[in-house]
Amino acid sequence: MATDDKVAILTDDEEEQKRKYVLADPFNGISREPEPPSNETPSPSESAAIPEEETDWIEKHCVKINNDLLISKVFYFFFYSAYGSLYPLLPVYYKQLGMSPSQSGLLVGIRYFIEFCSAPFWGVVADRFKKGKVVLLFSLLCWVLFNLGIGFVKPATLRCVPKIPPTARPTNSSHPFTILPANSSIVPSITTSTRTREKRNLPPYDGLEMLVSEPNVTETVIFSTAPNKTSAPTLQPQTDEITDRVMDLTSHPSTAPSTPPGNTTRETTTSLVTTTKSLPSDQVTLVYDQQEVEAIFLVILVVVIIGEFFSASSVTIVDTVTLQYLGKHRDRYGLQRMWGSLGWGLAMLSVGIGIDYTHIDVLIDGKGCKPPEYRNYQIVFIVFGVLMTMALIVATQFRFRYNHFKNGENKGKEVEIPQVERNSSTECSEETPTTTSHSQAFNFWDLIRLLCSVQYGSVLFVAWFMGFGYGFVFTFLYWHLEDLNGTTTLFGVCSVLSHVSELTAYFFSHKLIELIGHIRVLYIGLACNTARYIYISYLENAWTVLPMEVLQGVTHAAIWAACISYLSAAVPPELRTSAQGILQGLHLGLGRGCGAMIGGVLVNYFGAAATFRGIGMACLVILLLFALIQWLAVPDEEEDKTMLAERIPVPSSPVPIATIDLVQQQTEDVMPRIEPRLPPKKTKHQEEQEDVNKPAWGVSSSPWVTFVYALYQIKEMMQLTRDNRASEIQPLQGTSENRESPPAGGGTLPGPCETHSDPSRNQPSPQAAAASQTQSSPARPRVEESEDQQAQPAAGGH
């Protein structure tokens, strides 16, 4: 019967909802009370096999897992776990090998430039030959091989040398730590007297040549004497305050030329004496053999260049495949990439704690120096190799669709998400001046011209400088903390705090941009950078750096989101990938690379603390200049046309990442929105300016107030100039508006496309709207506009 059939009493809407639910469920509708698809009844044994709680848990946690996205999550976790366990510690490892800050900065910074150039090349190769999976696996294999090669480099020799330089002036010498003074001479006859001999302070006698080898605290003295034939002097070591040990003693007699009568003939005796002295520990220091350090530096540089060229494209390819898996739900990319940040933080913390409990014995050439406490960083390379091998195994499960593999995405190293589909018809797009028709005429050179303007060029410069600061911090923060006796456990805690702050800023960056605007977010980022760098420069205890690590999210994640969103709003969707690629190159490529290399040179000459202080002051100067430029040269109304950023990807990755889901507010053509705006609230200054009882110009007694007031007047004059330009263009816009509401004598009715067009397109800025209000009549609400349009047919009949 129909009354017993539960499906028969469902309405059409309920039937449609049920059909959508069944199609959306990947397991065809497993619920808490499963019903058979037909009139069959399940057996009691099958019903009792799966308990109610177990079915509910499976449905919530396991049923809707996408296997493809699970592979991406696991890959990101292992890959960034390997990356985070090794690369933040590489500068400290280079320091332990004896390299200078400039050498370490070059080894770290050159990776960004090679990566920026090689990733597009391998992307084109993978797309052209349809070998994306082969290129991916080969690049991951290069990650393992070339980075493991760095970990097994033999460190340079340590030598113990005195801090006080010797009094003798060095001459040409082949060894950097060998001091060869000028030829000295002693008296022709050396007796076995017991006079004391001070350290390298021999009297200038004829026939003595002394070779001092500083690093070993060892003196090799060669005595060339011309003794008398009858009484050959005996050479004995001096034993007053210094212990001399004769290593080798050889005599090479030779016959001297004939001498005048009355003089005796002499023989030449050469003696090699090596003296070993133990100096107090406060008078000696450890140095590296510079020739060995330079050889190690060149070997690692070649390994880094070759390895980075072959391995730079791995993350770009995986980003592209992951976005293909996501399909139209590409705004969830950040949820996949977040697993990489989780793995980075956990691996860095675990490895840092583990290294603190390892020590290696160092062989020192010389005596008197205290052995340094060196860590065994080979453990880091072993962990890196294991984790990257796991990522390589996971990468074998990726599935590639080559018909969706785009060169443009790899070339720009960005994956740009298209906007919401426009619902306007073809007839409307031909007659209505939409943003799409405008963007077709917007070529690449217009993009370059736009980005070179004062408004957007200043934002690009700030993006480059923030990348410069991030590259410097990534390379030399742990270097500076180790100088303050910081441990690798501290480095791991710093990494966890910075990643937590970046994830937090990632989730709330779009809310912050919506609340205060893009430019003010850049202000806050520059101010936080200033406070952070100056604070680090005055540290005395390494652990006190932790409070400032929470600013990493503001100084990097929020800045990245604001720059991406601000520049994407300025260009049409067709050129948005190019704009984001330029920003990617300036921030992640050129910015970080310059920060590592130029920062290394500055640290080498001025020290880490002074360099942090200098970059902090530079941040303050750039903040003031940027604020002045935005205040004078950029109108306030530009902020109303910005684009809010949703789901900006986690920007802690040092490799290229995708940019996703930029939601545009003002140019949506889906449905016209009726959003009446209240008149802007006037400031106190504007009220005083409009008050007829007060003079138009008032000079304050304070010179600073007068100066600021003069700058404000200059800004108002520049604003008035723009208003005049807008008023000159306004009649053309009025003509386009008349197509929507023609005058009474027009005699033509507006078409359906003009009726539903977005009025915001005909009014590009609130400033132009204000100019039209002052020229014609006050603006009326949208409802009154529609009433006038309804009254047009009667007027058109006349």
From Swiss-Prot:
Q: Which domain of life is it from?
A: Eukaryota
> InterPro entries given for it?
MFS_assoc_dom, MFS_MFSD6, MFS_trans_sf
Q: What are the annotated GO cellular component locations?
A: plasma membrane
Q: Give the region (Disordered) as residue ranges.
A: 25-50, 671-696, 732-798
SUPFAM superfamilies referenced in this protein's UniProt entry, alphabetically: MFS general substrate transporter (SSF103473)
Q: This chain belongs to which protein, by name?
A: Major facilitator superfamily domain-containing protein 6
Q: How does it sit in the membrane?
A: Multi-pass membrane protein
Where does the UniProt annotation place the signal sequence? none
What keywords is this UniProt entry annotated with?
Membrane, Phosphoprotein, Transmembrane, Transmembrane helix
Q: Which Pfam families does this one have? A: MFS_1_like
Name the encoding gene, please. Answer: MFSD6
Using the record's annotations, give every residue carrying the modification Phosphothreonine.
Answer: 11
* Residue intervals passing through the bilayer: 74-94, 106-126, 133-153, 295-315, 344-364, 378-398, 459-479, 488-508, 516-536, 553-573, 588-608, 614-634
Keyword Transmembrane helix among UniProt keywords: yes
Q: Report the locations given in the UniProt record.
A: Membrane
Organism encoding this protein? Sus scrofa
**CDD domains membership:** MFS_MFSD6
Lineage of the source organism?
Eukaryota, Metazoa, Chordata, Craniata, Vertebrata
